[in-house]
Amino acid sequence: MMNRVILFIMDSVGIGALPDAEQFGDLGANTLGNIALQENGIDLPNLQKLGLGNIDGIVGIEPVESPLGAFGKSLEVSNGKDTTTGHWEIAGIHLKEPFKTFPNGFPEDVINEIERKIGRKTLGNKAASGTVILDELGEEHMRTGSPIIYTSADSVLQIAAHEEVISLDELYKICGIAREIMMGDNAVARIIARPFIGSVGNFSRTPNRRDFSLDPSGDTVLDIAKREGFDVIAVGKIEDIFNGRGITEAVHTVDNMDGINKTIEYIEKQNKGIIFTNLVDFDSMYGHRRDPKGYKRALEDLDKRIPEILESMRDDDIIIFTADHGNDPTYKGSDHTREYIPLVIYGKKVKANTNIGIRKSFADIAATISDILEIPSTNKGESFKNSIIK
């Protein structure tokens, strides 16, 4: 009996603009394809062997004659291209309305309330790149002790503070207060703690980021699996994205390699259910920073670890490699891109060389996991279990 699914989110590894990408300002975006074009190819032999290059319409990765796994790609139904929207849809939620964004900064009354409740003035209150705003306001923050508030094209309120000026505990408390305030009409998908270290002109963000999300708007496959007595293990920022809902055990990570190490540790344990891992570096370190060289290197570093991941699996495990949105590092701006996500599925019980085509929703992943674990579904998406299992 199959009783465990390992789900790897390669954060932002999109594989081509969705049909509605123009509405999101993302015509021509192709995270994987454009990195390959700009950087003279990407060497991903292990993902290639599993079927990555055999996905319909993929650019930059050559197909192999007999891929070992099943493969396909998926459209996004929900109205958005952010982390929360993507992960929630993967887990079985369709969002008709996009989360609210604040491209011109947050309302004055909101900022005033945050300042009153945290007992500090704040800096910033505008849309900005996280690294640029540290260069601009980091020195003033060091001098005044005022946290830096900023946003992006996503539905986020981000709060940056130097770890020697505002302790991590206090920064997390400040973010918790902001989360309570940013509800109702002003609800953003996430409040993000952005701690940093260093000196003026040489600031750098630390891995101690923490996200404070909204509760999912309905039951996810995680909630259902937990209720049915399965383990739901969250590696990386998964716990934050779901606000802890439907999770039985969670561990945070410092980078992709740490995420892979911790996932392998969990695979080798006697658990059953879902191991749900987010590898965030592709997005946070290279996508937003428009660094195709770094992105390529990070993809190749993951690929080198694939044999080790697969060797740790049990005979009845199913592993799915996918993404949550795009973030084309060759594209204009510094924000996510509305793209297809890849689906590469492997296991001893998975039929080799199986093309599952273009899926109509990321929620097909949730439906398939429900089917594999034989638990009730979220009633979103269509299972591809019968297409892939021997």
Swiss-Prot record:
Its main location: cytoplasm. Binds 2 manganese ions. The keyword Metal-binding applies. Its cofactor is Mn(2+). It catalyses: 2-deoxy-alpha-D-ribose 1-phosphate = 2-deoxy-D-ribose 5-phosphate; alpha-D-ribose 1-phosphate = D-ribose 5-phosphate. Mn(2+) 1 binds at D11, D324, H325. One of its GO terms (cellular component) is cytosol. It comes from the Bacteria. Pathway: Carbohydrate degradation; 2-deoxy-D-ribose 1-phosphate degradation; D-glyceraldehyde 3-phosphate and acetaldehyde from 2-deoxy-alpha-D-ribose 1-phosphate: step 1/2. It is found in: Cytoplasm. GO terms for molecular function: magnesium ion binding; manganese ion binding; phosphopentomutase activity. Coiled coil: none annotated. InterPro entries: Alkaline_phosphatase_core_sf, DeoB, Metalloenzyme, Phosphopentomutase_DeoB_cap_sf. One of its GO terms (biological process) is 2-deoxyribose 1-phosphate catabolic process. Its EC number is 5.4.2.7. Mn(2+) 2 binds at D283, H288, H336. It holds the Pfam family Metalloenzyme. Keywords: Cytoplasm, Isomerase, Manganese, Metal-binding. Belongs to the phosphopentomutase family. Isomerase that catalyzes the conversion of deoxy-ribose 1-phosphate (dRib-1-P) and ribose 1-phosphate (Rib-1-P) to deoxy-ribose 5-phosphate (dRib-5-P) and ribose 5-phosphate (Rib-5-P), respectively. NCBIfam families: deoB, PRK05362.1. This is Phosphopentomutase. The gene is deoB.
